């Protein structure tokens, strides 16, 4: 008599098995969507950027939540079982106007480029969380967005972008052991699992602006700084450098995101003999300066930190920054071969032209992520962190021709070299003003 087979219960798979998306190509990397955003009609407010430095997307467009990229097969015969894509999180933590497509599309391009170069030969999935937090929305949204990405199995997260959210997430990131590659220039955002391919460097920006004003021969300047996680750092480093250089601050004003009394403050600065103006902060307040200067009929030399690059967020924001010099990241026009070639590939891949700083920043960030994954012993967050620290002298599309990305133990600030520049926005033209390369006074 044969034994009666048991009737269970059976141990079923807790999670579904990997599936092949069926999109792989023999000679090039392939993605399941034509671009990172799905808006391709006129049913969204706003329009594409009118000038080369403005955002190339549409205000209000949405991201595909899941974007899958396959490496070229190049005739490889597998054992038949599909590999599950390694997941990279994208944390959208702020309103970015016309720039969402200019973040996601270069991210796709960077991963496709790396796969075409043979850097990594396993599928990758971008998982997008739109979880906007500080300074305009509640802090908890961004925290939950990051945790959701980690719970989805992401091995690294691109973002947050801004200082408030990077700093408020820092302890959580270290606790969850899933590295963030943020864009913040906050000097305090650097710890075990916190990296940056940064859209600036707040202390350095304050010093750069003071040195720029001194280089123009100014002895009296007015100073604005914006309330927020990094506002005091902007103020402190500028103030200390201005004092060292013999600059007198005629009036110091702390601004809220929606500033009050700008005309009165500027009028008082002019009456006090201010020869130039400095602004340091997140950037919300900068939207209002053009109107205030026009009302006064005053056009003094003025300089700000990387909030200047909000010119790419929306066409209206660019108009608000008319007449300012600011800390930028794009190098001298035509000088960075990596930037020029990437822009050509971008146009060929996505059928549109967009050359603003976010395109370069997004590309460099995604390159860091995919190379960190490729360097890792296995696709876990802890090993990807170690893989990021192995990146050495990686070419950068941002900055000048000498800019590169490099990490190491206790060195999680990626950009090295000429990654900060000075530009001026005037009469609708974004003009390169120079690299900032100070010299010792003793040089004569």
Task: Indicate where each model-derived feature is located.
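Extracytosolic ligand-binding ectodomains
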Residues: 1-444
């Amino acid at each position: 008599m044969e034994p009666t087979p048991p009737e269970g219960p059976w141990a079923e798979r807790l999670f579904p098995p990997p599936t092949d998306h069926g999109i792989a190509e023999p000679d090039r990397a392939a993605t399941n969507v034509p671009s990172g955003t799905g808006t391709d009609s006129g049913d969204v407010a706003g329009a594409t950027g009118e000038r080369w430095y403005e955002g190339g997307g549409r205000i209000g467009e949405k991201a595909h939540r899941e974007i899958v990229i396959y490496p070229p097969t190049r005739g490889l015969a597998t054992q038949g079982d599909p590999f599950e894509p390694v997941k990279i999180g994208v944390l959208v933590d702020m309103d970015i106007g016309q720039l969402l497509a200019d973040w996601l599309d270069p991210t796709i391009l960077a991963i496709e480029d790396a796969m075409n170069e043979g850097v990594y030969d396993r599928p990758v999935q971008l998982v997008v969380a739109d979880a906007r937090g500080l300074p305009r929305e509640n802090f908890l949204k961004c925290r939950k967005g990051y945790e959701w990405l980690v719970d989805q199995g992401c091995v690294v997260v691109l973002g947050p972008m801004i200082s408030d959210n990077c700093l408020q997430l820092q302890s959580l990131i270290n606790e969850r052991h899933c590295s963030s590659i943020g864009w913040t220039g906050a000097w305090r955002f650097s710890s075990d699992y916190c990296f940056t391919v940064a859209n600036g460097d707040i202390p350095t920006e304050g010093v750069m602006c003071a040195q720029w004003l001194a280089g123009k021969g100014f002895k009296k300047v007015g100073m604005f700084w914006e309330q927020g996680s990094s506002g005091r750092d902007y103020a402190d480093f500028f103030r200390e450098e201005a004092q060292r250089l013999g600059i007198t601050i005629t009036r110091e004003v702390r601004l809220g995101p929606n500033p009050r009394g700008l005309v009165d403050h500027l009028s008082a600065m002019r009456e006090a003999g201010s020869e130039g103006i400095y602004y340091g902060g997140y950037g919300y307040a900068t939207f209002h300066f053009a109107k205030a200067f026009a009302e006064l009929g005053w056009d003094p030399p003025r300089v700000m930190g990387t909030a200047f690059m909000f010119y790419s967020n929306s066409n209206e924001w660019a108009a608000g920054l008319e007449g300012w010099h600011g800390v930028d990241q794009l190098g001298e026009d035509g000088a960075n071969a990596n930037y020029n070639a990437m822009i050509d590939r971008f146009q060929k891949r996505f059928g549109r032209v967009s050359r603003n700083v976010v395109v370069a920043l997004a590309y460099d960030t995604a390159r860091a992520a995919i190379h960190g994954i490729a360097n890792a012993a296995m696709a876990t967050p802890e090993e990807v962190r170690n893989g990021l620290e192995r990146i050495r002298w990686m070419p950068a599309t941002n900055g000048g021709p000498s800019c590169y990305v490099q990490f190491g133990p206790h060195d999680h600030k990626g950009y090295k070299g000429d990654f900060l520049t000075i530009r001026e926005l005037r009469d609708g033209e974004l003009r390169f003003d120079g690299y900032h390369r100070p010299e010792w006074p003793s040089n004569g």
